[in-house]
Amino acid sequence: MRYKPLLLALMLVFSTPAVAAHDAAHNRSAEVKKQTKNKKEQPEAAEGKKEKGKNGAVKDKKTGGKEAAKEGKESKKTAKNRKEAEKEATSRQSARKGREGDKKSKAEHKKAHGKPVSGSKEKNAKTQPENKQGKKEAKGQGNPRKGGKAEKDTVSANKKVRSDKNGKAVKQDKKYREEKNAKTDSDELKAAVAAATNDVENKKALLKQSEGMLLHVSNSLKQLQEERIRQERIRQARGNLASVNRKQREAWDKFQKLNTELNRLKTEVAATKAQISRFVSGNYKNSQPNAVALFLKNAEPGQKNRFLRYTRYVNASNREVVKDLEKQQKALAVQEQKINNELARLKKIQANVQSLLKKQGVTDAAEQTESRRQNAKIAKDARKLLEQKGNEQQLNKLLSNLEKKKAEHRIQDAEAKRKLAEARLAAAEKARKEAAQQKAEARRAEMSNLTAEDRNIQAPSVMGIGSADGFSRMQGRLKKPVDGVPTGLFGQNRSGGDIWKGVFYSTAPATVESIAPGTVSYADELDGYGKVVVVDHGENYISIYAGLSEISVGKGYMVAAGSKIGSSGSLPDGEEGLYLQIRYQGQVLNPSSWIR
């Protein structure tokens, strides 16, 4: 229905020339008929005029004959009167005049009925009035009876001549009119046939034009229908593409959130593992039940109760840490499954987008532009994520290699120490065996007064972890490596979907110092981190300083707490400042719990 006004307009536009052509043909036909009628009427009018002229001439001739007869009667009356007058005067004179009149009348009568000299109808017509006048005079002068008869004969003869002439003229005129009418009818018939032929040709042309116009309108209607269907398909495709773009954007946002949460969980798991490792290592190294037993035996009751409560609290905390680790690992597995599902859904949506783009076939649609922009953004973010993961893996690989080298050195040192210890042990073995029995007897005497609970308790992991000046004893007391503002905290979101696995200090270029004593194990550039310095603080603790503009130390350097190791700069992503990480056995720790 939306194209009905357009169709009516098209039909009106195309039908106007056809109607005009039909009217023109009809007008031409009427004009031809009118001209034919005028041609027919003109000869008839001319014939009418001619016939009227002829009839007038005949009528004039008849009128002239009547007038001549009337004059004859009058002359007859006059002659009679004159005759009576002459009779009254003298009989002789009238007789003599009568004879002379008879002679004269006969001569005139003979002359009047004689052969005409010229034979011209017009001359005879002209002499007729004279003959009539002579006859009148003869009748008046001669014998009145004979003169009247002659006059009547003359009039009758003239009438007959005139009648014959008029009959011939009428016949000729009738024949002429018939021939002319026949010719006129033939011309009219030819004109009518020509007009009819022209009318038929015009109608054929009009019919052909109407058929062409109908075909054109049909094609136009078909094209409009096809265009409407195409536009409807484009509209549906655009709607579908817009919906898919929205789903793709939502899926990508959800994926980024899930990935960020996954990274956060991984970081927490790593920190928890590091904490558990520290506890286990501390318990293994510093497990001294005999010393604790001696302390509990000799301690006052108040000190003993406080120590036991503290020890139970620490052990309970350690158990909670282990439980948290189990929960985090389960959540991590669930999060990884969600991410895998979201990635599969995202790939399916992207395939659907590509299919819709191919089917739609429109290059100037805003939805396609948005889809291409969105795909480009997703690809860019994905590349950034891959780069960050690659950089993280590269850093972990570097630290792993450093740890391997360090372990090799430790093995070598341990082997040397073992050999030295074996030599010393061989020398002191005898003395040690002799003193062993004495020490055992002394311990049995000391343990006789302890309860079973006192004998089973162990020292808490926080007691005696490392040496008194070790890195583990400095937690919460370390100084900031640079004078800056911490803007990227541990576990917070980072641009590109990653999270901070340390602390980022925003600052202009400034001096960077070591947070604790140690040995420089790496000082060079690293992809994704810029210039990097790694300091080994012993006991499997290391600190990492990334984003340096310059490095002031080299591999193998011994540094103290507060020693300058370089100057801050910016990370490859553009963040200006210093990025600090603290790790234990390769697992990240939260620097905020170590820096005061």
Curated annotation (Swiss-Prot):
Residues 25-90, 161-184 have a biased composition (Basic and acidic residues). It comes from the Bacteria. Residues 177-281, 318-454 form a coiled coil. InterPro entries: Cell_wall_metabolism_enzyme (IPR050570), Dup_hybrid_motif (IPR011055), Peptidase_M23 (IPR016047). Keywords: Coiled coil, Signal. The keyword Acetylation does not apply. Residues 1-20 form the signal peptide. Belongs to the peptidase M23B family. This is Uncharacterized protein NMB1333. It comes from Neisseria meningitidis serogroup B (strain ATCC BAA-335 / MC58). The lineage of its organism: Bacteria, Pseudomonadati, Pseudomonadota, Betaproteobacteria, Neisseriales.
